């Protein structure tokens, strides 16, 4: 069974109204965090729809489908209720691509609007987000992220929406 997700991880409190406005769902995963599935198509579409052009600071060697659109930071701020405040809540972006135990993962963590340069994997990103691993488990397994194996089907429509905009 594969594991292929792209997601935003944000802390609580979580703004459910903002989640509806952004067409996302925040799944509680424990330790005060929410997992928000999205996709590269989702971020490209939202970036275009909002007229944004800025990019996130993402390592150049990350795959092309790793979200680089700065709209991700806006989404994280909205979900955290930080849109009108000067505080910028930490957030992480994670991507997995595994099948049969073979594959890879990528992650970035952002604190105060800046990427934590040392973070390149999910466990490191989760540590930045404050996750304390349970005895005998890593951070990923502590939160049960293996249960979230693929991007939900409702996000597939963003591929067509991007095509419709010529993106």
Language-model region placement:
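Charged interaction segments
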Residues: 31-33, 37-167
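Short, extreme N-terminal segment that most often corresponds to the first beta-strand
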Residues: 1-30
């Amino acid at each position: 069974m594969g594991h292929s997700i792209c997601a935003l991880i944000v802390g609580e409190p979580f703004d459910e109204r903002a989640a509806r406005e952004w067409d996302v769902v925040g799944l509680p995963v424990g330790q005060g965090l929410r997992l928000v599935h999205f996709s590269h198509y989702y971020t490209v579409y939202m970036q275009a729809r909002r007229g944004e052009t800025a990019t996130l600071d993402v390592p150049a060697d990350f795959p092309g489908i790793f979200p680089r659109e700065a709209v991700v930071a806006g989404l994280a701020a909205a979900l955290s209720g930080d849109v009108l405040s000067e505080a910028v809540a930490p957030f992480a972006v994670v991507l997995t691509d595994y099948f049969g135990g073979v594959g890879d993962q990528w992650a970035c963590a952002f604190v105060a609007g800046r990427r934590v340069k040392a973070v390149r994997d999910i466990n490191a990103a989760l540590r930045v987000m404050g996750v304390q691993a349970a005895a005998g488990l890593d951070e990923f397994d502590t939160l049960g992220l293996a249960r979230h194996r693929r991007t939900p089907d409702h996000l597939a429509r963003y591929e067509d929406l991007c095509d419709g905009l010529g993106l």
